[in-house]
């Protein structure tokens, strides 16, 4: 059985990857903060602050993901922290072609069982 933080993280990943925006928002603390980083040339990371900023950017990015393509590679966590690695298909290839993204997501869960902090690192797998 997964830890409480891993369960919340997996529910969140499932929600945004299937474009369930209500559930995605429901799992966020009001003052959520996320940082996205990558080693991919031509892509920039960024910081997302608060639910509205988070949802705006998450919805824009997640719309490029092929629903149902998320594959969970590994999870580890405890009551408040979760680390999840996943791959999924996303339309970031030439001309919007689907490519595989590898992503590591680190979460901090608050006392209300909401995502307070998220750290994402990603790269595109070369075939």
Q: What positions do the PLM features span?
A:
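Short, low-complexity N-terminal intrinsically disordered segments enriched in polar/charged residues
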Residues: 1-30, 127
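A beta-strand edge to alpha-helix "cap/lid" segment located at domain peripheries
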Residues: 4, 56-127
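Hydrophobic pocket/interface hotspot
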Residues: 12, 24, 32, 51-54, ...
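Hydrophobic alpha-helical core bundles mediating ligand binding, dimerization, or RNAP-core interactions
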Residues: 9, 13-16, 28, 36, ...
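N-terminal/domain-start segments enriched in small and hydrophobic, helix-friendly residues
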Residues: 5, 13, 34, 40, ...
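A solvent-exposed, acidic/Ser-Thr-rich amphipathic alpha-helical stretch
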Residues: 26-79
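A structural signal for well-ordered alpha-helical scaffolds and beta->alpha junctions
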Residues: 17, 21, 51-58, 100
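Charged, low-complexity, helix/coiled-coil-prone segments
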Residues: 1-6, 44-51, 100-103
